[in-house]
């Protein structure tokens, strides 16, 4: 995987607990599972935080290779039972908009750019996001870099967000 923007890579992958070699082999394993149809919808949910970060690396790389002529998505529905962290939210939005291993950002600024059309993604701004079972997410959210209310406020700036 070639990264053109070193700062973007460092922001996505800032866990010093793992080496670059760990990251390489984890990404390799995830790509293998994806190519062999072992990593389908919501596969990311069973991954630990490091593996989710690697999942988002792969999604970012694939997004750069995509043909952006696909139909624009106007609305997605998220189930709060699958959102327990900031990385879960990025993985889930990416999957709902772009399919398995879809990319819609891996940090606040990248998500905003994807939602508002600054980065070519298959979204019709403003994207409507319906977040079911929000209370479950709220009570189980583990914020590594932010709290769930920060995410809600941030998403509300670039999308139409409905919480249920």
Where are these regions (language model features)?
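Short, surface-exposed helix-loop/turn micro-motifs enriched in polar/charged residues
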Residues: 103-107
